[in-house]
Amino acid sequence: MARLFTPSESKYYLMALDAGTGSIRAVIFDLEGNQIAVGQAEWRHLAVPDVPGSMEFDLNKNWQLACECMRQALHNAGIAPEYIAAVSACSMREGIVLYNNEGTPIWACANVDARAAREVSELKELHNNTFENEVYRATGQTLALSAIPRLLWLAHHRSDIYRQASTITMISDWLAYMLSGELAVDPSNAGTTGLLDLTIRDWKPALLDMAGLRADILSPVKETGTLLGVVSSQAAELCGLKVGTPVVVGGGDVQLGCLGLGVVRPAQTAVLGGTFWQQVVNLAAPVTDPEMNVRVNPHVIPGMVQAESISFFTGLTMRWFRDAFCAEEKLIAERLGIDTYTLLEEMASRVPPGSWGVMPIFSDRMRFKTWYHAAPSFINLSIDPDKCNKATLFRALEENAAIVSACNLQQIADFSTIHPSSLVFAGGGSKGKLWSQILADVSGLPVNIPVVKEATALGCAIAAGVGAGIFSSMAETGERLVRWERTHTPDPEKHELYQDSRDKWQAVYQDQLGLVDHGLTTSLWKAPGL
């Protein structure tokens, strides 16, 4: 791509808008991938009274917050708006926005919106109970998180909005639209609607036809890193960017995070350790899981897809344990000037591998078609305080997260035949050196830890740079900009021990699911429609 301008390498910057589930960030990077400044604000999604599971996205308030973050980032960086070479946006997947025929956004929901449980059940019965299988084979998605049941819910309960709807996009595309006035979606994020064909990386309107829904609301599809438009005068006045700044198509947070980690070639594998843990494996061509346990999403790299298996609430479980049981450790850590998790890891490092047989029951491996979990619990506790204490439970949680990751990676290998030679571990979890080593020991693979552990915004900035003509290739730039902090090598003896722990945990977990099935305990989480 020809350059849109000829920047001095030390003078120009890239801005990424990162719209997560709980916050919006505007992050400024230099052209070597160094983070220069950030503006951040939390946002809250709106539960609609008398609509169980609803979680609407506040379009007006959240656009104001996005603009404030852009102004804050520019202020914190101390740079003039004309030195922002381009801007792009990424967001949580599954969140959707609807627009009327005048281009006004009229309704949106966050990724966690679960109002359409009844519609999921209805849709599963279509085509002699084969509709969900057809959706999955074409798109890599099941109905639980897709846009189809949400649109059907609107048709049933908010026909005023459904009739007005002229276009659908994802939240990242909405941010780009608010900046530029141009509507389009990218495959990586739109792929999570359950409406985008994995093979052709374009919409499959027949799926909406089969569901009895309108197929005339699908917006143009443009690849990540494509120039979409420029910042309008109206947007510039609100957000502080210069009129005419290039606005580039962004994408889904996980896929752009992989770009920022240099995970851009077939068979490369990442474990992204946040609130949820995503185990992601790059596949050279679209293929889906015959068992429907794993989701498959378009990568931001054209032609490539990612098999993704998700561990539920892994980071949230660790936060719960810290906040519920470790008040003393929080005070000690504060006095020492260290993070509480660092102190807990130091304590846990003195517990032997296997954590004296304690088995946490929280997330199961992903079972995308029938996705639910057992009730949270600890199994096989001892009343010996030397063996069963906070340090033991904390180590057991870290070991269990790694075991669930290994199970998720195994089920990807089962259908893809890809067995990775190493892992990239990123996100908040990778800050823990003990946790990183446990992941290496459980998986039996070398685990590489990047310097930039929250790489989503960096991947988004790379896309902005490609769209502006600064970088020639997303994949090559991702590989060039990633830097490594450390590598953890697996211990063969501990790996063998953890194999035994994994087998026992899987057997116990199945029994715990049976308690949920019989109504005796309450699932940690259950997908809509189950």
Curated annotation (Swiss-Prot):
Report the EC code(s) recorded for this entry: 2.7.1.189
One record GO biological process? carbohydrate metabolic process
For this UniProt record, the keywords arranged alphabetically read as follows:
Cytoplasm, Kinase, Transferase
Q: Where in the cell is it found?
A: Cytoplasm
At the top level, the lineage of the source is Bacteria
- Molecular-function GO terms, alphabetical: autoinducer-2 kinase activity
Q: Which InterPro entries match?
A: AI-2_kinase, ATPase_NBD, Carb_kinase_FGGY, FGGY_C, FGGY_Carb_Kinase, FGGY_N
Catalytic activity from the UniProt record:
(S)-4,5-dihydroxypentane-2,3-dione + ATP = (2S)-2-hydroxy-3,4-dioxopentyl phosphate + ADP + H(+)
Identify the GO cellular component terms for this protein: cytoplasm
Pfam families reported for this sequence: FGGY_C, FGGY_N
Alphabetical list of PANTHER family matching this protein: AUTOINDUCER-2 KINASE, SUGAR KINASE
User: HAMAP family given for it?
Assistant: LsrK
NCBIfam families reported in the protein's UniProt record: PRK10939.1
General function of this protein: Catalyzes the phosphorylation of autoinducer-2 (AI-2) to phospho-AI-2, which subsequently inactivates the transcriptional regulator LsrR and leads to the transcription of the lsr operon. Phosphorylates the ring-open form of (S)-4,5-dihydroxypentane-2,3-dione (DPD), which is the precursor to all AI-2 signaling molecules, at the C5 position.
UniProt similarity note: Belongs to the FGGY kinase family.
UniProt-recorded name of the protein? Autoinducer-2 kinase
Source organism of the structure: Escherichia coli O157:H7
Give the organism's phylogenetic lineage.
Bacteria, Pseudomonadati, Pseudomonadota, Gammaproteobacteria, Enterobacterales
